């Protein structure tokens, strides 16, 4: 006599139990990872969009959830906070000198941190432009116009803000090329800072001073901040003046090794920064008015970003280490010329 066949109902029950067990195992193995990205002042919108995209990508790839927390402020001040103990898994700062300080002062990243990702670990670029009020009432056309007596210039403090250091060096580099000497460039930049009524700690603070508080005739702005000011504070209230020359700003990113090793987040942190170089990451940069590194993605934004002559920090100043020591260290050129 043959044993009775298993009924279809029993088979369905067994299959359901197996699926439930697999689902429970998958749920149990999935985890939630938290990262802290310590960034500079005007990247809030960029990383709000990027964090959501990366979370979707990582969930699809691994099944794990990622929650990315953000901290924003002047780049130099943010670097100091990380040195003083802020537990950043990654830093996305305004300039290489600030990440260099994490190595030099606290040993949080290796000396060769900049070689670990493409493009010297700078996944997007920007520059410094001049934002003026509607109708350009002070007839500002180029750098020379902002050093005229009586023109009020808004720019953050280069001791705390990365954007301010880029702006300072953009003005210096323009003047040295136009007038032919470092002495003339120093006079030019000194005249510029005589026109600065207040130094905010970061770029976003300066944008608010100019756009909301309506202080100043011209804002020395990150290019993305100029776009955002026109978008967020009312169309037609401001105009962007593209100078004849400016500096190629290359904001870098890095995993903070000592933190991720302790927290066990190294793999996710690396993937997070690597995803900035993906097509989606590059497109998000472009949508937020940062210049993509990818040539293919950059072509899609060719009509957005104006063409202008750009010089690099290496060409004009011998790199960030030399520029930081000469101009922004205690007792450096900025301290000597800024008499407030």
Predicted features and spans:
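Short beta-strand->loop
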Residues: 38-40, 113-123, 132-134, 152-178, 192-196, 230-247, 259, ...
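Short helix-loop capping/hinge motifs at secondary-structure junctions, enriched
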Residues: 135-141, 160, 173-181, 259-267
């Amino acid at each position: 006599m043959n044993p009775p066949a298993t009924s279809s109902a029993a088979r369905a029950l067994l299959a359901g139990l197996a699926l439930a067990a697999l689902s429970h195992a998958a749920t149990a193995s999935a985890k939630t990872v938290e990262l802290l990205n310590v960034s500079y002042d005007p990247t809030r919108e960029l990383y709000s969009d990027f964090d959501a995209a990366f979370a979707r990508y990582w969930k699809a790839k691994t099944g794990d959830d990622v929650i990315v927390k953000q901290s924003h402020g002047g780049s130099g001040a943010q670097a100091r906070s990380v040195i003083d103990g802020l537990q950043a898994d990654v830093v996305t700062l305004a300039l290489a000198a600030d990440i260099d300080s994490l190595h030099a002062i606290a040993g949080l990243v290796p000396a060769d941190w900049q070689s670990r990702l493409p493009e010297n670990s700078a996944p997007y670029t920007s520059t410094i432009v001049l934002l003026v009020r509607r109708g350009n009432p002070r007839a500002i056309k180029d750098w020379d116009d902002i050093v005229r007596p009586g023109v009020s210039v808004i720019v953050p403090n280069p001791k705390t803000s990365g954007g301010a250091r880029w702006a300072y060096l953009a003005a210096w580099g323009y003047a040295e090329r136009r007038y032919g000497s470092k002495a003339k460039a120093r006079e030019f930049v000194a005249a510029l800072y005589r026109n600065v009524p207040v130094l905010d700690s970061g770029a976003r603070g300066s944008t608010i001073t100019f756009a909301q508080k309506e202080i100043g005739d011209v804002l020395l702005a990150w290019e993305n901040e100029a776009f955002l000011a026109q978008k967020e504070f009312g169309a037609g209230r401001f105009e962007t003046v593209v100078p004849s020359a400016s500096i190629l700003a290359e904001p870098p990113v890095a995993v903070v090794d000592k933190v991720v090793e302790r927290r066990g987040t190294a793999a996710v942190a690396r993937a997070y920064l690597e995803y900035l170089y993906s097509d989606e990451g590059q497109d998000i940069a472009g949508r937020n008015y940062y210049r993509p590194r990818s040539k293919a993605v950059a072509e899609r934004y060719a009509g957005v970003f104006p063409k202008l002559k750009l010089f690099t920090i290496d060409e004009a100043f011998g790199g960030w280490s030399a520029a930081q020591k000469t101009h922004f260290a205690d007792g450096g050129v900025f301290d000597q010329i800024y008499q407030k």
